[in-house]
């Protein structure tokens, strides 16, 4: 069953359907419809944030759902499914894969990533767990710890990982050449060409979110691009 889910992702597009509180599309109903549209378009899986969103999306789509819950805890950097409380809710909501922060930062309660994963696997031995990492070293460690999938989600979003304008192709390729766990490319992928390049670098599948499901960011990108360009004088005066 676990391998069946993983195999469905191979060489495919995973669409991240997430809207943060305060954004116009912040609604389980809207995210479920967005996920359905992604499935119709050929997405192989959905990445979703929040109990209500996961429940609503699972009712709409037949493809796998990668679930997470973003929650901040004072004094701790990890915010992607950082404790067992969030893990329990993600699994209760019906997610097929649970994504967690797998960086070197301690989780709430002082747990290491390895200790946290052990607790998850002891309670839910059949659930697939995705490691959201930010560096090559974290990816290598994630395989050693026993994660089922590794995603480059947090590259550029930790204090010690490189800030890049585009996808972290170097990280994708280095991990793909070294580990046997599927590498999922995520982060700053805006075009089909960038998605294909990530696969060419060894990614097992590609996650695209903002470029598909956050229209205010897509609009802002167009507006910024237009404002930064100079125009010809071919228009009639």
From Swiss-Prot:
Q: Name one GO molecular function term.
A: N-acylglucosamine-6-phosphate 2-epimerase activity
Against Pfam families, the record matches this protein to:
NanE (PF04131)
For this entry, the protein name equals Putative N-acetylmannosamine-6-phosphate 2-epimerase
- Give the EC number(s) listed in the UniProt record: 5.1.3.9
User: What metabolic or biological pathway is this protein involved in?
Assistant: Amino-sugar metabolism; N-acetylneuraminate degradation; D-fructose 6-phosphate from N-acetylneuraminate: step 3/5
User: What task does this protein carry out?
Assistant: Converts N-acetylmannosamine-6-phosphate (ManNAc-6-P) to N-acetylglucosamine-6-phosphate (GlcNAc-6-P).
Tell me the GO BP annotations in alphabetical order. Answer: carbohydrate metabolic process; N-acetylmannosamine catabolic process; N-acetylneuraminate catabolic process
Q: Which family does it belong to?
A: Belongs to the NanE family.
> Gene of origin?
nanE
UniProt KW Phosphoprotein keyword: no
Q: List the InterPro entries hit by this protein, alphabetically.
A: Aldolase_TIM, NanE, RibuloseP-bd_barrel
């Amino acid at each position: 069953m676990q391998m069946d889910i993983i195999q469905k992702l191979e060489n495919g597009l995973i669409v991240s359907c997430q809207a943060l509180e305060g954004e116009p599309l912040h609604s389980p109903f809207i995210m479920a419809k967005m996920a359905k549209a992604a499935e119709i378009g050929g997405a192989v899986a959905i990445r979703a944030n929040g109990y209500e969103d996961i429940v609503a999306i699972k009712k709409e789509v037949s493809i796998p759902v990668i679930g997470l819950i973003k929650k901040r805890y004072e004094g701790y950097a990890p915010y992607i499914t950082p404790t067992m409380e969030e893990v329990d809710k993600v699994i209760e909501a019906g997610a097929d894969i649970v994504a967690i922060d797998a960086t070197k930062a301690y989780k709430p309660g002082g747990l290491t990533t390895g200790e946290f994963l052990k607790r998850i696997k002891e309670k839910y031995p059949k659930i697939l767990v995705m490691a959201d990492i930010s560096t090559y070293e974290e990816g290598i460690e994630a395989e050693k710890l026993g994660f089922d999938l590794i995603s480059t989600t947090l590259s550029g979003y930790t204090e010690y990982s490189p800030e890049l304008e585009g996808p972290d192709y170097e990280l994708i390729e280095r991990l793909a050449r070294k580990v046997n766990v599927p590498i999922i490319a995520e982060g700053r992928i805006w075009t089909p060409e960038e998605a294909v390049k990530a696969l060419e670098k060894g990614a097992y599948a590609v996650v695209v979110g903002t470029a598909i499901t956050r229209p205010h960011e897509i609009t802002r990108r167009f507006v910024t691009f237009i404002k930064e360009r100079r125009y010809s004088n071919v228009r009639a005066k």
